[in-house]
Structures are given as C-alpha cells and as structure tokens.
UniProtKB/Swiss-Prot annotation:
Main location: membrane
SUPFAM superfamilies for the chain: Fibronectin type III
Official protein name in the record: Insulin receptor
Role of this protein: Receptor tyrosine kinase which mediates the pleiotropic actions of insulin. Binding of insulin leads to phosphorylation of several intracellular substrates, including, insulin receptor substrates (IRS1, 2, 3, 4), SHC, GAB1, CBL and other signaling intermediates. Each of these phosphorylated proteins serve as docking proteins for other signaling proteins that contain Src-homology-2 domains (SH2 domain) that specifically recognize different phosphotyrosine residues, including the p85 regulatory subunit of PI3K and SHP2.
Extracellular-side positions: 133-210
Localization (cell): Cell membrane; Late endosome; Lysosome
Biological source species: Macaca mulatta
Amino acid sequence: VSNSSSQIILKWKPPSDPNGNITHYLVFWERQAEDSELFELDYCLKGLKLPSRTWSPPFESEDSQKHNQSEYEDSAGECCSCPKTDSQILKELEESSFRKTFEDYLHNVVFVPRKTSSGTGAEDPRPSRKRRSLGDVGNVTVAVPTVAAFPNTSSTSTPTSPEEHRPFEKVVNKESLVISGLRHFTGYRIELQACNQDTPEERCSVAAYV
C-alpha cells in the first residue's frame, strides 16, 4: 500500500508450511531502471496528444436516423422490442465517445511525421540507406581480422562495476514494514525472506518478490 509519494506500507502473511520456528524476516528493496523508450520519445511533437476525459455526445446523421426508423417499422409488425432505459443509452454514448477518443490517441502516437531533411526543411520520403547492386557486392573483398595466439598476452576486458548495495531491514515479531525514502514515480522490486535463525544466512527461505 502506498502511504505517500516516498513511502510504502508492506504487509505479508507468515508461511503456510514453515520449516521451523520463524524468528525474523529479511526485506530487501531495489530501485528498477527506467524504460529507455521513455527517454527516446520526443514529447514536444505537435502530433502527440493525450486522450481527453471530457465527454462529448456523438453526432448522428440523418441517414442513420432514417435507417433506424425503417428497421423499427419493419420489425413493428412482428414483435415489439422493449425501449432502452436512459442509463443504457448514456452508457452506449460514453462507450462510443471513449472508443473514438482512444482511436484518435492511437493515430497520434503511432503515426509520427518523418523528420525533415537538413537544409530544405521539407520532409524526406526517401529511405536513408543507399541501394547497392549485386555487382558491387561481388567485387568487394572483406578482410577478417584474426587474433594472434601469444601466451603472455591477455585481452583487456571492460571492468564491471560492483553490485550496488541493496538496502534491507530486519523485521522481528511482526508481519509489516514501512519503507521510507523512496523516489516518486519509480518502480521498486521488493524481496521478502522468512528466517528461523540469525546465522547462517542459509537458514532463510527462498525470496518472495513483490
């Protein structure tokens, strides 16, 4: 449960089949990385619009009114249909309006205008890759580099950064915890372990992810 923009109230139940007496719980939490697509998206595009929640009644043309009237006249001789209530009509209008708004939003997001070419200011419909003929490809010789086998030489590898220290909390005699100091609008992965001894760490259960 989110208590505020920087706190989470975590509650859990004890294991249904505990392996021994549960003495304490270990809670770890780790901030998740942001999606790269959120940074690549240009939010200043004119065509990018968010769907509006304002409701506007749909416009019904005269042709559709005549069509509905003719269908009603044809079916009037056979059977009588129950009229729709005001709530049913309002619900259908809201669904139709929401569907149109959502479709407009999809068109604005998916169909993004092509970037303009440098200098002219007009849209460049041509593809960016240059077309090559098969003759050009057949006359090209590619040299594949090989690595010489020197016994005293080792390849230089990129140094890996050490694992970031994950904050954790030891919870005793209760099944809840308030995690503070969190970043708003950010995803966190929370791990929970049930333990029956302080040491060693192998006395804890498999982590449950939240």
